[in-house]
Amino acid sequence: MIPGEIKVNHALGDIELNAGRETQTIQVANHGDRPIQIGSHYHFYEVNDALKFERENTLGFRLNIPAGMAVRFEPGQSRTVELVAFSGKREIYGFHGKVMGKLESEN
């Protein structure tokens, strides 16, 4: 085995990422003058303000792409992306500091 190598049993078929998780598809446009790249685990609600979309609907979501991947938006480009809900504790810290804690309040 090579360090970092992943052995996959192809007989089992395709692996479905984020199975059973809430997703949404949105249209995003880069109104800026520079390319913007968003990584796989970045809280989409907090991405660069030059990206225009229905931001309020993306609270608690990230891109539904494999870990370590990214999506690049060129200036003037508009594209459709799929988002997936964060799971686990659903606590978000950092990024742009727009959300610093739990996504849902405890009852």
From Swiss-Prot:
> What induces or represses its expression, per the UniProt entry?
The probable operon is induced by urea.
Pathway assigned in UniProt: Nitrogen metabolism; urea degradation; CO(2) and NH(3) from urea (urease route): step 1/1
GO cellular component, as recorded: urease complex
The principal localisation class reads cytoplasm
Residues of the signal peptide: none
Q: Name one GO biological process term.
A: urea catabolic process
Catalytic activity, reaction form: urea + 2 H2O + H(+) = hydrogencarbonate + 2 NH4(+)
Q: Which NCBIfam families match?
A: PRK13203.1, urease_beta
Q: Which family does it belong to?
A: Belongs to the urease beta subunit family.
Q: Name the chain's protein.
A: Urease subunit beta
Its source organism is Escherichia coli
